[in-house]
Amino acid sequence: MAILLVMALIMFSLDKCYSTDDKCEDSLRREIACAKCRDRVRTDDYFMNVAHLNLHLKSVRRCCTNDLHCFLRYKTSEM
């Protein structure tokens, strides 16, 4: 009986792992996008302080604010 219980737990954990695989990939893609966004925000701050390149800043802000979750996550982590 204990062996059946252990086997059921193993099968349940494997099934749970495989069923959440897509969510994990989406999360990984989101993390990569956030990293790119974070780099662009840093570039944005650099150019704002150094050269005032308005066209560059507008394109950077548009990219980052399109993914509002990412943008807010990065900005709140700085505080």
From Swiss-Prot:
- What would be an example GO MF term here? toxin activity
Q: How is it modified after translation?
A: Contains 3 disulfide bonds.
Keywords from the named record? Disulfide bond, Secreted, Signal, Toxin
Q: In which tissues is it expressed?
A: Expressed by the venom gland.
Question: Hydrolase as a keyword?
Answer: no
* Signal peptide (from-to): 1-19
Q: What is this protein called?
A: U-scoloptoxin(03)-Sa1a
Q: Where in the cell is it found?
A: Secreted
- Family statement: Belongs to the scoloptoxin-03 family.
Task: Tell whether Disulfide bond is among the UniProt keywords.
Answer: yes
GO cellular component terms, semicolon-separated: extracellular region
Q: Give the highest taxon in the source lineage.
A: Eukaryota
